[in-house]
Amino acid sequence: MPNAESATADLRRLADALVGAEPLNWVITGDSITHGLVHTQGVRSYPEHLHEIIRGERERVRDVVVNTAISGHRISDILDDWGRRVESWRPDVVTLMIGTNDAATGGERTEVSPEEYASSLHDFVVRVRGLGAVPVLQTPPAIDVANAPERARIGEFAAAVRRVAADDHVILVDQFARFAALGDGEVPWGLMNDPFHPNAAGHAALALELTTALGLHPAGARSRTVALLEGVVVAARLRG
């Protein structure tokens, strides 16, 4: 897909590509949240929901949707393994959700400042655009800071994603703001499996926000998944 280098142009080109015949390669990367292990208890993760919407309901059966996220990783890990994580897949669209581990303090790894994190995000965007692909930045979802105090800086890192998206004119999916809204400004308990990993309903919420931001909503008789995910989120909020 040609390089557009602005969020508005990227969205327009993506919309055109979605109604075209040429297959697209989608790379979804990040940390444990995107990796999608354990915390959904066997239910689909948000990349898997995206796969169903793109290759099922949108009927883009020749598209390839690849999840290269790895639990515990930071943005620096993705940049250091760029070939395997992104470049080798010859992507047309690359989505990134990272920051939950970058924001952590007190562990064995060197602490990262929001400024260093933002610089790495900028590097990521430049590299993606250098491949001729559309970059998509997602803020990490809001968490239960009281029970994960080592990640108390998560809001600063979400703000850094927003700044980079604005400065570099990148499509932004603000999952942090969405989770905060779903929790009415507090922790959205029904969407979390632990203080910072979304559960199956949380992944439904992530998938809905990403689907909406990228204009992926299918229309007509095949449009089933979005309504199902909306129901899952509503039910989880009531239980939470």
Per-segment meaning from a language model:
Residues 92-107:
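Active-site microenvironments of hydrolase-like enzyme catalytic domains
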Residues 97-101, 124-156:
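Active-site segments of SGNH/GDSL-like serine hydrolases
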Residues 140-240:
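Catalytic His-Asp segment of secreted/periplasmic serine-dependent ester chemistry enzymes
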Residues 70-92, 108-120:
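Catalytic-core regions of hydrolytic enzymes
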Residues 2-71, 83-90:
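Serine-esterase "nucleophile elbow" of acetyl-processing enzymes
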Residues 36, 68-74, 103-115, 144-149:
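Surface-exposed cleft-lining segments at the edges of enzyme active sites
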Residues 113-138, 162-170:
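Charged, glycine-enriched surface loops/patches
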Residues 26-29, 64-69, 93-97, 135-139, ...:
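Structural recognition of the beta-strand scaffold that forms the well-ordered cores
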